[in-house]
């Protein structure tokens, strides 16, 4: 489990003001928010790529050495490509082991590539595979270090519906059998119903969405069917309390 407490960040304006969030093991947490509300800033805090502006607990312990923790325990897939086009997929994965300071483990590499359904692309370069395959390879790259925390910034934004569904389902299958916390920052409504926990950035706080909303949707058999989910939501929840309305923005 990861706990972020008392997160306060101000640049030319206030981004976060005493915000908090908890990430659970073996689960996908999704953070929503309009552009400029601080989703990427939050990922950078969790990814230890910026000076800490919060109390950060990983497995109940404070972060003593951010550089080592980031190197060994955190995988981060940015919006920009994290793969090298002058290297094959296999060479990229080997390089991921090198970056994390771990010895190359071919069995682990093959297991992860199979879990992302890209094992047949080992000898291809990233610029010669499809967009969906490339994104799954980027996630595989981040998983090679066996991270405790995996951060994904808009991972499905450029994918069609088929590849979007495949990516999020493969990721969900993987993390529910591995002790990893996953945080996804996204605008993509197609993947919202895959979240174990949902948050939205509002008024400089990280606000949890009510679990009852998810449970009601599950009883209607629309879970994991994004189009039906959105239709149901509009028909049955739009007249409910104002605390729900921001979810559609």
Give short role names for the model-derived ranges.
Residues 160:
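ABC-family nucleotide-binding domains
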Residues 150-153:
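Catalytic Walker B motif of ABC-type/P-loop ATPase nucleotide-binding domains
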Residues 125-129, 133:
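Conserved ABC ATPase signature
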Residues 106-121:
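Conserved ABC ATPase "signature" region
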Residues 47:
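Helix-to-loop junction immediately C-terminal to a conserved catalytic motif
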